[in-house]
Regions:
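Residue-level signature of mid-helix packing/kink "hotspots" within the transmembrane helices
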Residues: 5-13, 97-98, 215-224
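Conserved MFS/SLC helix-loop-helix module at the cytosolic interface between two early adjacent transmembrane helices
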Residues: 10-46
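Membrane-interface helix termini in secondary transporters
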Residues: 16-17, 21, 105, 227-228
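Short hydrophobic/alpha-helical segments at membrane-entry points of transmembrane helices
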Residues: 47-55, 173-174
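Helix-loop-helix hairpin linking two adjacent transmembrane segments in secondary transporters
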Residues: 89, 93-138
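Juxtamembrane intracellular "pre-TM" segments in multi-pass secondary transporters
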Residues: 141-173
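Extracytoplasmic gate region of multi-pass secondary transporters
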Residues: 166-223
Length: 228
């Protein structure tokens, strides 16, 4: 899990720069397809090293999603509906975590290979569906076309943009706000099923759903209320 988080964190700002320059619809679709494909391939892994490198690839592909998806939402929603739309979108993260806990149940009934295969196939199918349902906001595309030449001249350099970002206090406050709960949050989500199983003698098939549902439910409520 650590290699995924390190690469995800390193790639996130790079993914943001990519999302500013290419079609975000295809970044979302491609990101979902690749990380679902990687999930599927994990079912064929024979050793730790194969799982390790597949998780590393997943970190790259997942990092491309959030900047593209959130900026698309911002283009389609203005005013009060924007916060709610982002909140509703983020509920998917926690619903997915809750459902993901049942992966332990599926693994107990069938095998962990089957679990990776099923979740991967569902994700790849959904990415194909998004090809037909997801699109860029045409108003933004039209607004950018006439001033494309001027926009290239006015666009700040990479170092200029980073300098402007790092000199903004709001950026550091938000960064700390996300970092502080993430430190215990990721540790809890990763190890709580194992803790329940080994310390409380709860079968992993039950420990998985119990640990993910409890955290995901409160997070689900929080992002909805925050969006409102």
């Amino acid at each position: 899990m650590a290699v995924f988080l390190w690469i995800y964190g390193f790639m996130s700002p790079i993914a943001g720069m990519i999302a500013d320059r290419v079609n975000r619809k295809w970044l979302v679709v491609g990101s979902l397809f690749v990380w679902s494909g990687v999930t599927y391939l994990m079912g064929y892994a024979d050793n730790f090293h194969e799982l390790y490198w597949l998780r590393a690839v997943m970190g790259v592909s997942e990092a491309l999603y959030i900047p593209s998806a959130l900026s698309l939402i911002a283009d389609w929603h203005q005013g009060k509906s924007r916060s709610l739309a982002i909140g509703v979108h983020m509920t998917g993260l926690y619903v997915g975590q809750a459902i993901g806990g049942f992966g332990a149940t599926v693994a107990a009934i069938f095998s962990w290979h089957t679990t990776f295969h099923w979740f991967g196939i569902v994700g790849m199918i959904y990415s194909v569906v998004l090809i037909f349902l997801l699109r860029e906001n045409p108003d933004r595309m039209i607004a950018e076309q006439p001033s494309s030449a001027a926009g290239k001249e006015k666009r700040p350099s990479l170092f200029g943009g980073l300098s402007m970002l790092f000199s903004t206090w709001a950026f550091w406050i938000i960064l700390f706000y996300f970092a502080a709960p993430s430190l215990p949050g990721w540790a809890t989500k990763n190890w709580l099923p194992t803790l329940f199983s080994e310390s409380l003698d709860i079968p992993m098939a039950e420990a998985g759903p119990i640990s993910t549902i409890t955290i995901a439910f409160s997070s689900f409520v929080g992002v909805i209320l925050g969006g409102i």
